[in-house]
């Protein structure tokens, strides 16, 4: 049901024509994988004050895929921040995370948020 709703959403709201919606969905899937990779890297690194960097990097990588990737990054980021707010996390931290998310999606360098000493692997 969810994939069907996504396709309808693409047609009606985003105005994706019939020849581009496959490309859009492919980009969205790739963007979702980029966001997941940034999340798993953040968990693996377990580095203090690195979450903004990984937020920006995941959104940047996803948005580089195209409109579908940028859409997936926005949906995932907004859902993640909404979930954090429901759990009682501070609004200031959420605003800072959203700033990093938008920074990455806009194509700006995510290394702006890179904490000192973070291994070059990331």
From Swiss-Prot:
SMART domains linked to this entry: SAA
Residues annotated as signal peptide: 1-18
Region Disordered: start-end pairs: 100-122
Domain of life the protein comes from: Eukaryota
Subcellular location: Secreted
Gene Ontology process terms (BP): acute-phase response
Keyword line: Acute phase, Amyloid, HDL, Pyrrolidone carboxylic acid, Secreted, Signal
Residues recorded with modification Pyrrolidone carboxylic acid: 19
InterPro entries: Serum_amyloid_A, Synovial_Prolif_Regulator
Alphabetized Gene3D superfamilies for the sequence: Serum amyloid A protein
Tissue specificity as recorded in UniProt: Expressed by the liver; secreted in plasma.
An example Gene Ontology CC term for this record: high-density lipoprotein particle
Primary location recorded for the protein, binned into one broad class: secreted
Protein family per UniProt: Belongs to the SAA family.
Subunit structure: Apolipoprotein of the HDL complex.
Function summary: Major acute phase reactant.
Protein name in UniProt: Serum amyloid A-2 protein
Gene that produces this protein: SAA2
């Amino acid at each position: 049901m969810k994939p069907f709703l996504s396709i309808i959403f693409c047609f009606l709201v985003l105005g994706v024509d019939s020849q581009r919606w496959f490309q859009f969905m492919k980009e969205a899937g790739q963007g979702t994988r980029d966001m997941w990779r940034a999340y798993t890297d953040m968990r693996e690194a377990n580095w203090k004050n690195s979450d903004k960097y990984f937020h920006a990097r995941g959104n940047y990588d996803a948005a580089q895929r195209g409109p579908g990737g940028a859409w997936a990054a926005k949906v995932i980021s907004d859902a993640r921040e909404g979930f954090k707010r429901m759990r009682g996390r501070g609004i200031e931290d959420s605003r800072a995370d959203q700033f990093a998310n938008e920074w990455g999606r806009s194509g700006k360098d995510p290394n702006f948020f890179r904490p000192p000493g973070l291994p070059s692997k990331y």
